[in-house]
Design a protein with these regions (language model features):
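PP2C/PPM-type serine/threonine phosphatase catalytic domain
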Residues: 1-364
């Protein structure tokens, strides 16, 4: 893919270390692209990582995660998204594990990951850990991702209610993370509708975004302290994504801010209309010429056939293929906010000029 300076969607991000004096171990990156020189399909890529580990371990792990993932996405052609994500998650996890083993003070470090890869108006997501992805549409909010935590498993098995899970001692026990001894499996389930099952959730990858849709990627510093309906109300009531992002973080901090909090908000403009400029050089002329020759051959064949079968007439009934339009109605989620690990400062990839609002992240040697 080719980097571009501006995104075709509205984006705002904000990160805060919290109120306990700890370092910010959250990292994020947002970058815009087009697929290639011949296909100007716009692409937006966003990733958030919440570092795990004492000393500087969480910061280092989150840095490694974001840098590996963003640079791999940038080098890809943007056409084999799932394969690219699966590969880069393993690579990032292995890099974190190797770095952790190289220094005693970094042992046991890891990171969560939540990413959104938007090609045109098609949404693709993947998560590892308890950083979340939400969709807000038509006055409703839906958690698209599934937490990889002990309490989430307990909720699914009916052992805990969502309300009790929030106060459980194991609320911060994560089942999947980058840097684990065995590379984690990225979760491609996209919970667009309720009760679709894992296979149905995965089939929602590539779902179409609509005007005024808002996506939220966030670390658990937000969702530990702010409920889903509160997130929705803030995003709906604020005049801009910038104000909404800051208000979300401020609310978490006002309730103790015991962890780092990072949010990335992505909205589809109200007047959004996808237009793609394709520059293929001589290709259109070649295709046009070939089509012209083919047309002459077809017409000649028809005339010849008509002369030979003057008294015959053949009519064929054209087939019609209905257009499938997917405009899902999101259902409100009753699952409250849970888990936590560690989080940190705002960053952005160091691959080229970034979309103005964010600083540039520095690579770790």
């Amino acid at each position: 893919m080719i980097r571009t300076v501006r995104s075709h969607l509205n984006v705002e991000a904000h990160s805060h270390a919290g109120m306990t004096g700890k370092n910010n171990e959250d990292r994020y990156a947002v970058a815009s692209f087009v697929l290639d020189d011949n296909n100007k399909m716009p692409v937006l890529f966003a990733v958030l990582a919440d570092g795990i580990g004492g000393h500087r371990g969480g910061e280092v792990a989150a840095d490694l995660a974001v840098n590996h993932i963003v640079q791999a996405a940038a080098k890809s052609d943007g056409r084999h998204i799932r394969d690219t994500i699966e590969d880069v998650i393993v690579e990032a996890s292995d890099a974190i594990a190797a770095h952790s083993a190289s220094k005693d003070e970094l042992k046991g470090m890891g990171s969560t990951c939540a990413l959104a890869w938007i090609v045109g108006d098609k949404l693709h997501t993947a998560t590892v850990g308890d950083s979340r992805i939400y969709m807000m549409r038509a006055g409703r909010i839906q958690q698209l991702s599934t937490d990889h935590t002990w309490v989430q498993e307990a909720i699914e098995k009916g052992i805990l209610t969502p309300e009790r899970a929030r106060e459980h001692p194991n609320v911060h026990v994560i089942r999947r993370y980058l840097g684990s001894p065995e590379p984690p499996e990225p979760d491609f389930r996209l919970r667009w509708f309720d009760d679709e099952g894992d296979q149905g959730d995965e089939s929602n990858q590539g779902v179409q975004l609509l005007p005024d849709d808002v996506l939220l990627l966030c670390s658990d510093g937000l969702t530990d302290l702010v409920w889903d309906d509160e997130i929705l109300e803030i995003v709906r009531s604020k005049p801009s994504l910038k104000e909404a992002s800051r208000s979300l973080v401020e609310l978490a901090n006002s309730r103790g801010g015991h962890d780092n909090t990072t949010v990335i908000l992505i909205s589809v403009p109200s007047n959004f209309k996808l237009t793609v400029k394709n520059d293929a050089g001589w290709l259109p002329w070649i295709i046009g010429g070939a089509a012209g020759v083919l047309l002459i051959l077809v017409v000649g064949s028809v005339l010849t056939f008509g002369l030979l079968r003057r008294n015959s007439s053949v009519t064929s009934t054209p087939t019609t293929r209905p257009l499938f339009t997917q405009t899902p109605l999101l259902q409100p989620t009753n699952t409250p906010v849970l888990p936590a690990t560690t989080a940190t400062p705002q960053l952005i990839l160091p691959i080229a000029p970034t979309y103005t609002p964010w600083p540039t992240n520095t690579l770790i040697p």
